[in-house]
UniProtKB/Swiss-Prot annotation:
Zn(2+) 1 binds at residues 67, 107, 141. The keyword S-adenosyl-L-methionine does not apply. It holds the Pfam family AP_endonuc_2. It comes from Natronomonas pharaonis (strain ATCC 35678 / DSM 2160 / CIP 103997 / JCM 8858 / NBRC 14720 / NCIMB 2260 / Gabara) (Halobacterium pharaonis). Binds 3 Zn(2+) ions. GO terms for biological process: base-excision repair. HAMAP family: Nfo. Zn(2+) 2 binds at residues 141, 173, 210, 255. This is Probable endonuclease 4. One of its GO terms (molecular function) is DNA binding.
């Protein structure tokens, strides 16, 4: 059975994320440990952490992934932002270890004029400064590629992995890949994309999927998510992606919108329908 869940809230306690996931009929999931729009430390007490670990195990929900702050910029040439980003990431990987969450997901960020190679060097060296606990892996998320943001090409993802001797793998976001020019709207396009990823990065580095349809055309670098099968990737592309052998054992987490009377439960059900139809 396909592993699929959604991004859930920790409001009222991190263990509430498990209950929310169960309401959605999800079997894995993603959380923020704090508001992603501000520099803030995770504030998760021992009792909360124990309750989260126990409830996840009891309900069979996992693997979970922590999504890092949107303010983190590993590629930045600015020393103060770099130090804040490293500090934030250290606290996220420590929180992951406490919660027994195996993954922390991060966007590489933007080089803001320093250039692609320098940006990749900056990201890799920032990641090298982390003391990543055993059992935790940092996932570099593929990006839509607007402005000077890095991580939109498989070559850039591989560039960071090759430069860094840390437990690093990749989270592919379907909407971001599509925006970056990887055409996932047809079975042929999906197959070609996975072949290119395997040749450049390696499928052994693919640990998680952000499964989202896109409201914008392929190659526009515009990141706006749509309901599964109802965006520009469409039903045929989503079906081909969900059922491709490359992701047979890779969990999917949704970041789809709540609109038009549809939210996470509808999208999770839709993923399972597309999986079963193949």
């Amino acid at each position: 059975m396909v592993q699929v869940g959604a991004h859930t809230s920790i409001a009222g306690g991190v263990d509430n994320a498990v209950e929310e996931q169960l309401e959605y009929d999800g079997t894995c999931g993603q959380i923020f440990t704090h508001s992603p729009q501000v520099w803030q430390d995770p504030n998760i007490g021992d009792e909360e952490a124990t309750a989260f670990r126990d409830r996840s195990a009891e309900a069979g929900v996992g693997p979970w992934v922590i999504h890092s702050s949107y303010l983190v910029n590993l590629c930045t040439p600015k020393d103060d932002l770099r130090e804040k980003s490293i500090d934030s990431m250290q606290k996220e990987v420590d929180a992951a270890a406490t919660l027994h969450i195996p993954y922390v997901n991060v966007h590489l960020g933007a080089h803001t004029g320093a250039g692609v190679e320098q940006g990749l060097d900056n990201a890799a060296s920032a990641l090298e400064e982390l003391d990543i606990p055993d059992g935790v892996t940092v996932l570099i998320e593929s990006d839509a590629g607007s402005g000077t943001k890095l991580g939109s090409t498989f070559e850039e993802l591989a560039g960071v992995l090759d430069r860094c001797d840390q437990p690093l793998d990749v989270c592919l976001d379907t909407a971001h890949m599509f925006a970056a020019g990887y055409d996932l709207s047809t079975p042929e396009g999906v197959a070609e994309t996975f072949e290119a990823f395997d040749e450049t990065v390696g499928l052994d580095h693919l640990e998680y999927i952000h499964l989202n349809d896109s409201k914008h055309d392929c190659g526009t670098n515009k990141d706006e998510h749509a309901h599964i099968g109802e965006g520009k990737i469409g039903e045929a592309g989503m079906r081909a992606f969900i059922n491709h052998e490359a992701v047979a054992d890779v969990p999917f987490v949704l970041e789809t919108p709540t609109e038009n009377g549809k939210s996470y439960p509808w999208n999770i059900k839709r993923v399972r329908e597309l999986y079963e139809e193949a």
